[in-house]
Amino acid sequence: MASPAPAFSLANLLNGSYGVDTPEDVERLRSEQREEAAAACRNYRPLPAVDVSESVTEDAHSLRTPDGAPAEAVSDEFVTYGAEDYLEKSDDELLVAFETMVKPMRIGQLWCPAFNKCSFISSIAMARALLLAPRTSNRTMKCFEDLVAAIYTKSDFYYGEECEADDVQMDISSRDVPGYSFEPWSRTSGFEPPPICEACDMIMYQCPCFDFNALKKSCAERTFADDYVIEGLDGVVDNATLLSNLGPFLVPVKCQYENCPTPTLAIPPDLNRATDRVDINLVQSICDSTLPTHSNYDDSFHQVFVESADYSIDLDHVRLRQSDLIAKIPDSGHMIPVLNTGSGHKRVGTTKEVLTAIKKRNADVPELGDSVNLSRLSKAVAERFFISYINGNSLASSNFVNVVSNFHDYMEKWKSSGLSYDDLPDLHAENLQFYDHMIKSDVKPVVSDTLNIDRPVPATITYHKKSITSQFSPLFTALFERFQRCLRERIILPVGKISSLEMAGFDVKNKHCLEIDLSKFDKSQGEFHLLIQEHILNGLGCPAPITKWWCDFHRFSYIRDRRAGVGMPISFQRRTGDAFTYFGNTIVTMAEFAWCYDTDQFEKLLFSGDDSLGFSLLPPVGDPSKFTTLFNMEAKVMEPAVPYICSKFLLSDEFGNTFSVPDPLREVQRLGTKKIPYSDNDEFLFAHFMSFVDRLKFLDRMSQSCIDQLSIFFELKYKKSGEEAALMLGAFKKYTANFQSYKELYYSDRRQCELINSFCSTEFRVERVNSNKQRKKYGIERRCNDKRRTPTGSYGGGEEAETKISQAESTGTRSQKSQRESAFKSQTVPLPTVLSSRWFGTDRVEPPCERGGVTRA
């Protein structure tokens, strides 16, 4: 009789008597389980009397659940032996059971999966519970041993659809290997019949003609593939392929090779060059995705809308003179780009267009600065400038050079424009406060997505005549060269022959960048900036009278646009076209930067006009608010900062050298420019092509590392995909290769009449009929056969100058005429008459004048 279970108490809990099953309890639980199993069998299928002491058959697949679904077999293993029985077994017995149920893979002395006693017994208990639980799924659950293995390895408890419970061998043919099919091969006993010699009918091993050394050598060269039968194999299969296909079971298979489908290649094999993948449609798609508002932009009639619509503007002290406007000189037309990149047409300097440009570029000067002591603070800023940038020893040992030679170079440069030494005026007799004004006909490319809501305004140029500029430019050019020689080593001005953006031994990677964007830079400069540059010019060695004189006629000036009839006074703002524009903007930017930031924290500093860029190992520390409160500038610190200056990215190659790369976004916009004049021999288009090649000479240095840098910097600056920048480089490489590729980007809207003769050339006759129609020119009646020239004087009533044709000229003319006639008669092949209906330039490779049999009408 079973003893009652011990009561719960602290003593029974500590001595281990509470919670431990006695042998009687174990026997009682087993009896109850046997009764439950027998009752289930009696309820769902009539069974003969079964002795509960006997084990239920292992393969009892005929049990049925109440809903008619087949149930799993009630195995003797989980009825007779529970988790408690395995706890009583020794470690060796558990290892045998683990190897029988889980079937681990042996790798040397290791098992995979590794044996864990607790996990193994827990898996047995869970498998026992799952088999007794009611079935809720139509899938076939694994048998007890496989279920224990599935729980232990954390795999599926059910058999797959292609596998049955009694067949768990892997179907090798079901593997998806392209081009190969595998079928199971029957195992062989490994016995090989000995080879029989045909000559002596003896076993080759005993035959005197048997070469044992050759057989030994051949057996030594046997590989894994020689141990398996491979039939119908047309391709080449190596050992690695066989191992991956056979798997860990190493079952002999029959391998059969089939033809693989033709692979789909993103790049056709015949396109072996990177530029072959680039066409005009790809470049246009890049523009559409990168510049979404530019692809549909067309400003062909924007200026017409401005001129014909009502116009309202608020300006002070403006003088309009509409009586002597200069009419627009008609040009010969411009080439039309194939790409639509948002480039605008050339702006005409009409009155409304000039007033709009003056309103934005010259008028409405911002007043953001505080009230300061100009004389004292300007000297302090100039002193900080020399301490931060100038090498005192170099400045003391340097002097002016090449002033006269610079003057002669300037005169030679503009000699073709009519500038001569005799035309140079006396500067003391000239009013230097008067400046000419004009607008730039070319609008700067817009990189922001605002063309759908904002019309770009052209920039303005305020300039002196060349005769005045020629006398100041040589002096400031020599002074700027001296200024470059006196700079510290870490200061770089990317201009001229002395310095550029090429920096050897300097890597821009792993550096902190600082880029300050100064808006409205020219018109925001006031008297404070004029005093600063006056002190700096005196410190650099410019003669004090010239400095004083130069600054005096920049305090108050008057600008006038003769073509538009507009004039207005201006004060201290920068003149955008005089001899000191770039030099003055550069030293003002450097002075402001030195006052707002400590320049000693930077490894490299680059300045060019109103652009600035600094590199440092640590994050830069400074007060950029002084740009606004002290220097009256609208300043913005670019975040995230990238190495970008003068519309160029700075990249470093594998050798640690830095070079500049033009902004791909601006360059791809220039491919759609609308300012190239038309010419019959494409001379203007070729000039633009050479300029394009010169700007993109960096392409030969672009390695994959540099392309990755450019993609990252492009994404950080424009928040656009860096892959587009890499595609732009491929387009640049194609269109810089030769001029014929570049000509695909433009065409002309001039309709050319191409007349091709359809009759024999020997029947062609040209007859000139003397016309009685009279022509009048400068008041003189002339007939078409009159050999007299028009008057050479400036007035229409001048005397006629008779023209005598020399005998040599007439002889040369007759010889040229005979040569043309003989060349024309040599063409005996009749050609059909074709009138071209397409625009000239869209599909041409060479001009019509170079095609045979084409005559322009």
Curated annotation (Swiss-Prot):
<dbReference type="GO" id="GO:0003968">
    <property type="term" value="F:RNA-directed RNA polymerase activity"/>
</dbReference>
<comment type="function">
    <text>RNA-dependent RNA polymerase which replicates the viral genome composed of 3 RNA segments, RNA1, RNA2 and RNA3.</text>
</comment>
<comment type="similarity">
    <text>Belongs to the ssRNA positive-strand viruses RNA-directed RNA polymerase family.</text>
</comment>
<feature type="region of interest" description="Disordered">
    <location>
        <begin position="782"/>
        <end position="829"/>
    </location>
</feature>
<dbReference type="GO" id="GO:0000166">
    <property type="term" value="F:nucleotide binding"/>
</dbReference>
<dbReference type="InterPro" id="IPR043502">
    <property type="entry name" value="DNA/RNA_pol_sf"/>
</dbReference>
<dbReference type="InterPro" id="IPR047309">
    <property type="entry name" value="Bromoviridae_RdRp"/>
</dbReference>
<dbReference type="InterPro" id="IPR007094">
    <property type="entry name" value="RNA-dir_pol_PSvirus"/>
</dbReference>
<dbReference type="InterPro" id="IPR001788">
    <property type="entry name" value="RNA-dep_RNA_pol_alsuvir"/>
</dbReference>
<dbReference type="GO" id="GO:0039690">
    <property type="term" value="P:positive stranded viral RNA replication"/>
</dbReference>
<dbReference type="GO" id="GO:0006351">
    <property type="term" value="P:DNA-templated transcription"/>
</dbReference>
<keyword id="KW-0547">Nucleotide-binding</keyword>
<comment type="subunit">
    <text>Interacts with replication protein 1a.</text>
</comment>
<dbReference type="Pfam" id="PF00978">
    <property type="entry name" value="RdRP_2"/>
</dbReference>
<dbReference type="GO" id="GO:0003723">
    <property type="term" value="F:RNA binding"/>
</dbReference>
<keyword id="KW-0696">RNA-directed RNA polymerase</keyword>
<feature type="domain" description="RdRp catalytic">
    <location>
        <begin position="511"/>
        <end position="624"/>
    </location>
</feature>
<protein>
    <recommendedName>
        <fullName>RNA-directed RNA polymerase 2a</fullName>
        <ecNumber>2.7.7.48</ecNumber>
    </recommendedName>
</protein>
<keyword id="KW-0548">Nucleotidyltransferase</keyword>
<keyword id="KW-0808">Transferase</keyword>
<keyword id="KW-0693">Viral RNA replication</keyword>
<feature type="compositionally biased region" description="Polar residues">
    <location>
        <begin position="804"/>
        <end position="816"/>
    </location>
</feature>
